[in-house]
Amino acid sequence: MQIDIIAPGRVKERYLRDAIDEYSKRLSRYCKLNIIEVADEKTPDHASEGVDRQIKAREGERIAKHLKDGAFVIALAINGKQLSSEELAAKINDLGLRGTSHIQLVIGGSIGLDDAILRRADFLLSFSKMTFPHQLMRVILLEQIYRAYKINAGEPYHK
């Protein structure tokens, strides 16, 4: 299974990069992981809704260039479906059983994802009604993917 994580911006904080590297290494036993960083846009303080839409559209265009035909696209969205770790594991397992060999997970930038990306997604996933920093979300997402593979393999993993 190939798993792509697509997100705007670079992770700058060393501790987050270290965590991303650790989970990437752990996941290498289970899947082919590809982290795709697209250029992000600077969001001015107190930007109007129109400016926010333009920023999301530009980031969305960059993200869309990496979405592959035949891939199952999961967009992280606050209004998406919340799953337990076991349910996410079952979803990944079910996709594999149905012949899906490529999953792309998309994380939005600091103001979220463009509507075009949300419409293109095959599934909207929410981790919470709360908002998380998009750089931290990469670590959380990687940990949950790793946990899903451990669950599917019947291997122990701390709770």
Curated annotation (Swiss-Prot):
Specifically methylates the pseudouridine at position 1915 (m3Psi1915) in 23S rRNA. The keyword Nucleotidyltransferase does not apply. It is an enzyme of class 2 (transferase). S-adenosyl-L-methionine binds at residues 76, 108, 127-132. Its EC number is 2.1.1.177. GO terms for molecular function: rRNA (pseudouridine-N3-)-methyltransferase activity. GO terms for cellular component: cytoplasm. CDD domains: RlmH-like. Keywords: Cytoplasm, Methyltransferase, rRNA processing, S-adenosyl-L-methionine, Transferase. The gene is rlmH. InterPro entries: Alpha/beta_knot_MTases, RlmH-like, tRNA_m1G_MTases_N. Homodimer. It comes from Bifidobacterium longum (strain NCC 2705). The keyword Cytoplasm applies. It catalyses: pseudouridine(1915) in 23S rRNA + S-adenosyl-L-methionine = N(3)-methylpseudouridine(1915) in 23S rRNA + S-adenosyl-L-homocysteine + H(+). It is found in: Cytoplasm. HAMAP family: 23SrRNA_methyltr_H. This is Ribosomal RNA large subunit methyltransferase H. Belongs to the RNA methyltransferase RlmH family.
